[in-house]
Amino acid sequence: MLRTTRWVAAIIFLYSFPGYAEETFDTHFMIGGMKGEKVSEYHFDNKQPLPGNYELDFYVNNQWRGKQDITIPESPVKPCLPKVLLTKLGVKTGNLNTEDNCILLDKAVHGGQYQWDISEHRLNLTVPQAYINELERGYVPPESWDRGIDAFYTSYNLSQYRSYDSNNNSNTASYGRFNSGLNLFSWQLHSDASYSKPDDMKGTWQSNTLYLEHGWSQILSTVQIGENYTSSLIFDSLRFSGIRLFRDMQMLPDSMQSFTPLVQGVAQSNALITVSQNGYIIYQKEVPPGPFTIADLQLSGSGSDLDVSIKEADDSVRSFLVPYSSVPNMLQPGISNFDFIAGRSKIYGVKNQEDFLEANYIYGLNNLLTLYGGTILSDNYNAITLGNGWNTPLGAISFDATRSSSKLNNDITHEGTSYQVAYNKYLVQTATRFSVAAWRYASQDYRTFSDHLYENDKINHQSDYDDFYDIGRKNSLSANIMQPLSNNLGNVSLSALWRNYWGRSGNAKDYQFSYSNSWQRISYTFSASQSYDENDKEEERFNLFISIPFYWGDDIAKTRHQINLSNSTSFSKDGYSSNNTGITGIAGEHDQLNYGIYVNQQQQNNDTSLGTNLSWRTPIATIDGSYSHSKNAWQSGGSISSGLVVWPGGINITNQLSDTFAILDAPGLEGAHINGQKYNRTNSKGQVVYDLMIPHRENHLVLDTANSESETELQGNRQIIAPYRGAVSYVQFTTDQRKPWYIQALRPDGSPLTFGYDVLDLQENNIGVVGQGSRLFIRVDEIPTGIKVALNDEQNLFCTITFQHVIDENKTYICQ
C-alpha cells in the first residue's frame, strides 16, 4: 500500500518555489518510494497517482462515505470504479450507458469533478445533486459499518468504604462492578455482574444482565438472547430471560429517530427552499420544478413551528407554516419502531416467575398523527395498550388507554383500565416551554405485569411489599414550565406533582421553583421546594448555590489550570439549615488530577465536617479516594477502575471502557495522544484504547504526536470509522520505525548536492532524500556501510559516502 508523509509534503512545498523549478525531482525521496518515477509524473496536483493498490477514504460532496480499496492501473489506462462501489457511495449509475461493470471516474462523477489526495489517503468526488442518493450529514450507510474484531474485554470498579462514629463503632462495605464482553463471529456476549460485601457478612455475587447480541443492518434492528431488561417503550421495564428483537433507532439518521414533520410542497421552477425555526435558517436546498419532500430536518428541541419559504426563479416568494410539537412515541411519517420479546420474568425477590410475550409497535402515519400500541400476554395476565400522538398548531398531545387482567393464584381476578394524557407546547413569542402529563387508574383493580407478579408472590409466600411496591395508584398529574427571561436576566423553571391513591384519604403534593443566571464568570441558582405527604405533613426547603471559576495559563506557553469555588446554603421554614463551601480543580501536565476540598456545617446537630476527594487518571486506571471528619464520625473511601482488552494483537489495559470502543495501532509510536485526551497515550507498542465511540456514526480518530518523543514517523494521523453497537474496532495507522539520521554532505568541489535527489544504500535501495542546504535525510534499520547520491541523474552519475558503523550528525561529509 502506498503512503506519503507530512514531511514529504513539506519537501514538495519547498520544491515548488521558482528557485528550484529547474530540478527534476525523483520520487525516491519517499521513504520506501517507487524507483524510477519522477515527481512530475507522480501528480500531486490532482492527476492520476502512481499505479498500485490504495485504501482510500471516499468523500462524496464533502461527506465521508466509507473506506474502500482502489487499484490504479498503469498509464495510459484511466482508473475506474466498480458499479457496486458507486452504489455503496450513493452515486446513481442507472443513466450511465456502459456494459462494463467498472465505470471511468470521468463518467462516474456525471460532469462533476474528482480530486486525489494521496497524502491523506482520500478521493474526493463532486457529483451534481441530482445524481446522488443523499445522506443526512453525519450518517453513515450500513454498508460502511464496522463489525470489529474478535476480542474479550472487561471493565471493573472496585471500591471500599469505612466509617467510625464517636462510640468507636465501625462499618466497612466493599463493592465491585464488572462489565465484560466477548466478541466472536460478529456476535457479542455482554455481562454485567457485581459483588458486594457488607460489614461482617458474607459477600455475594449477583448477575444483572447476561445476553448475546447481534445487529442486523438489513432490517435496522438488533436481537438479544439471554437475561436483560425489556424496554419502557410502552409498558414498564422489567427484568427477563429470553429473546428480544427491536428496532435500533440509532441505526437510523438522527432526523428519523424522533418526530420531525415532513416539509412538502410544489415548486413552479428551479426554486430555493428555506426552512426556518425561531428566526434561524435550519435548512436550505435548491429543487427542480415539481413536487418536493424534505425528510432530513435536524430540529432543535424547542418544538416551535417551522416557517417554509419557496423562492422561485422569478424571485417570487411563497411561504407557509408547518406545525411542530412532539410528545414521547411520536415518529416521522413513514417511520416505524418495534420491540418484540418472548421470555420469562426474572424480577429480584419474586419466587414465582411467569412466561410471557410482549409486542410494541409505533408508526408515524403523517405530519399530524402517530399511532402506537402494545400487548403483554401470559397464562394469568394480559394487557393491551392503544394510543395516538397528535401534532397540532396548538401543541402536541398524546392519549392512550391500557386494559389489564390479572388472575391470582387464589383465583381472584383483577381487571382495570388506566389512561394517560400528555401535552407539550413551545411558545415562540415568549420562548416558554411547558408540558403536562396525567395518569388515571379507573379502578383499584388495574395491575401492571410487575404488580401481578409481586401480588402473586405476596399471596404465595406471605411477603409484605407494601413498603416499596404500591398497587393503589389512583390519579397523578405533573406539570413543568421553563421560561428564559429577556435581556439575559436568567432562566426560571416551575414544576408540580400531585398524586393520590385508592383507599387513602390524603394527597401527596410536590412543588419546585428554580432561578438561575450568571454574571461574568459567576453563576448562581436559587431553588425552593415544598412538599406534602398523604398526612398533609409539610416540608419546605430553600437553597442558594454560587459557583466562581478561576483560570490561568493558555495551554500553549503555560499549562492551563482551573479552580472552581462554590458555596451552597440551605434553609428550611425554621431558618438556616446547612452550608457547604468547596474548592474543586484540575491539575497535572495531562489534566490527570481532579481534586476537591470542602467544609460542611449542619445547624441541626451543630456539627462541622471537613472533607477532601482526589481522582488520579493514568493511562491504565483511574484511582479515587475520599476522606471526611467531624466531631462525631469520620469516613474514608477508595476505588479503582480500569479496563482490560484481550485481542489477537495482544493485551491492553486502559483506564475506562464502554461496550463500543476502538483499538488504535500505530506500530512503534509511543506517547501520542488520542482525540485530545491528554491522559490517554499510545503505549510502547504504539497501541491505545479509545472508548468514546458512537455506534453507526462517523468517528474521527486523530493521533497527536506533539508531545511524543518517539523517533517513529506517523504517516497520516487521522482515520474515520463507523462501528456497530458493541463492536471492538481495530484501526491501524501507518508508521515508519526505521531510525532517522540527518547528514550534512557536499560534493567533492564543496558545492551542495542537488535538492530532492534520492539517497540510496549500496544495494541501490531507496533510503532517503537530499533536503535543503545539502542536508541528507535517511531512515534505516541499521547504519549502512555507505550511501549513494546522484550527481547527475540523467547521466546516471553518483557519488558515495562511506561510514565505519557510525554516523556523526555534527560532521560534514564529502560525497566522493
What does each model-identified segment do?
Residues 65-78:
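Short acidic/polar beta-strand-loop edge motifs in secreted extracellular
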Residues 16-18:
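N-terminal signal peptide c-region/cleavage motif recognized by signal peptidases
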Residues 3-10:
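Sec-dependent signal peptide recognition
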Residues 23-54, 65, 84-89, 96, ...:
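Flexible, glycine-rich linker and terminal segments associated
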Residues 294-305:
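Extracytoplasmic assembly/pore-lining segments of large envelope/extracellular complexes
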Residues 180, 340-349, 357-375, 385, ...:
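Core alpha-helical transmembrane segments of integral membrane proteins
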